[in-house]
């Protein structure tokens, strides 16, 4: 996780989705083609149904981060160790329990979203 930049969304319309774990924002097609740079264990590029499970079109705000490790905003949003890219400020729905268990198995942190 971290050093190679994530794909930048090719469109900023209604087709944007955010990863429910890391909050990376890309289009559905980008998740289908390359998966999530921060969450490769979801294997979205192999299982296209998983994209709908682990991403959401419902999110608030977008921040672009070029150097997450040096950005106070990235650290405040808890994305300081993720790949440079576009992230949402907040998602309003949790990752499905099955995927939360997968995160535990992979020993990666998952923080439930705050109530909005």
From Swiss-Prot:
GO terms of biological process kind: regulation of DNA-templated transcription; transcription elongation-coupled chromatin remodeling
Principal place of residence: nucleus
GO cellular component: nucleus
Zinc finger annotations (C4-type) as residue ranges: 19-39
Gene3D superfamilies: 3.30.40.210
UniProt-recorded Gene Ontology molecular function terms: zinc ion binding
Entry annotated with the keyword Repressor: yes
UniProt key word Zinc-finger: yes
InterPro entries cross-referenced by the UniProt entry: RPABC4/Spt4, Spt4, Spt4/RpoE2_Znf, Spt4_sf
Cited Pfam families: Spt4
Protein's cellular compartments: Nucleus
Keyword set, alphabetical order: Activator, Metal-binding, Nucleus, Repressor, Transcription, Transcription regulation, Zinc, Zinc-finger
Annotated family: Belongs to the SPT4 family.
Role summary: May regulate transcription elongation by RNA polymerase II. May enhance transcriptional pausing at sites proximal to the promoter, which may in turn facilitate the assembly of an elongation competent RNA polymerase II complex.
Protein name as it appears in the record: Transcription elongation factor SPT4 homolog 2
Organism: Arabidopsis thaliana (Mouse-ear cress)
Lineage of the organism: Eukaryota, Viridiplantae, Streptophyta, Embryophyta, Tracheophyta
């Amino acid at each position: 996780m971290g050093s190679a930049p994530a794909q930048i969304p090719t469109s900023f319309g209604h087709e944007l989705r955010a990863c429910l774990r890391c909050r990376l924002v890309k289009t559905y097609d980008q998740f289908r083609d390359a998966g999530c740079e921060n969450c490769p264990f979801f294997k979205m590029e192999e299982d296209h149904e998983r994209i709908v499970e682990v991403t959401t079109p419902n999110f608030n705000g977008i921040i672009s981060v070029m150097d997450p490790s040096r950005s106070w905003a990235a650290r405040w949003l808890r994305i300081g160790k993720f790949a440079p890219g576009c992230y949402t400020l907040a998602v309003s729905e949790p990752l499905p329990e099955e995927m939360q268990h997968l995160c535990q198995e992979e020993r990666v942190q998952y923080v439930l979203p705050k109530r909005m």
